[in-house]
C-alpha cells in the first residue's frame, strides 16, 4: 500500500486550506488502496530557503530541512492543496518545495486548488515545478471557487461534482503512485 501526503499549502492566518485539506483527507480515508496523511506546512516552520548547497546536492545543513526531507521522502505520492495568490501558488508552498529535490523524484502528484477562479493558475504553475522535480502530475484536479464552493468566502461547502472530481484525482494519484514504485527501488 502506498503512502500519500495531503499537503496544506498555506500558512496564512484564517486560511481556507486546512478545511479543504481535511475535506480531501476525509474522502481519502474512505479508500483502502493507500494510506493518507495530512501534512501541514505550519508544523515545519520553514524559514525562507536558507540552505547553502542546492537541493539537488542533498546535503542539508539545517535540522528543519532534514525533518522536512524525512517527512517528504516517506511518501509515494502527494496531493497539494493550494490557494491562488496573484496567479500562482502560495510563497510558503513554493519555498517548501524548493528546499528539497530527490525526495520528490519519481512520485505522483495531484492538486486541489481554491480561489476566486478556482485556483487553476496556481496549479498550472505547480505543474511546471513538478516537471522539474521529476514528479508525474495527474490530469484530474479539483478547482474550488470561493464564490460557489464556500459560504461567505470562508466556510467550505463543495458540491457533489467537486467530490466526484476529488475522487477522480485520488484515483489517478494512487494509480500513478503505484505505477512509479519500481523507479524508486
Question: For each predicted feature, which ranges?
Answer:
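Glycine-rich, flexible loop/turn motifs
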Residues: 45, 49, 100, 134, ...
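Short, glycine-/small-residue-rich phosphate/pyrophosphate-handling segment
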Residues: 105-147, 160-165
Amino acid at each position: 500500500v502506498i503512502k500519500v501526503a495531503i499537503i496544506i499549502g498555506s500558512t496564512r492566518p484564517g486560511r481556507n486550506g486546512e478545511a479543504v485539506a481535511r475535506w480531501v483527507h476525509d474522502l481519502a480515508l474512505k479508500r483502502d488502496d493507500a494510506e493518507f496523511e495530512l501534512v501541514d506546512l505550519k508544523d515545519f516552520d520553514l524559514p525562507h530557503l536558507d540552505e547553502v548547497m542546492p537541493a539537488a546536492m542533498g546535503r542539508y545543513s539545517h535540522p528543519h530541512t532534514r525533518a522536512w526531507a524525512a517527512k517528504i521522502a516517506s511518501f509515494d505520492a502527494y496531493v497539494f492543496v493550494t490557494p491562488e495568490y496573484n496567479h500562482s501558488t502560495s510563497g510558503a508552498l513554493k519555498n517548501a518545495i524548493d528546499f528539497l529535490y530527490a525526495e520528490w523524484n519519481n512520485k505522483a502528484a495531484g492538486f486541489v486548488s481554491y480561489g476566486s477562479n478556482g485556483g487553476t493558475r496556481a496549479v498550472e504553475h505547480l505543474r511546471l515545478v513538478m516537471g522539474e522535480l521529476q514528479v508525474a502530475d495527474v490530469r484530474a484536479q479539483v478547482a474550488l471557487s470561493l464564490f460557489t464552493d464556500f459560504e461567505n468566502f470562508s466556510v467550505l461547502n463543495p458540491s457533489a461534482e467537486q467530490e466526484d472530481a476529488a475522487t477522480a484525482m485520488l484515483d489517478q494519484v494512487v494509480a500513478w503512485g503505484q505505477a512509479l514504485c519500481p523507479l524508486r527501488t
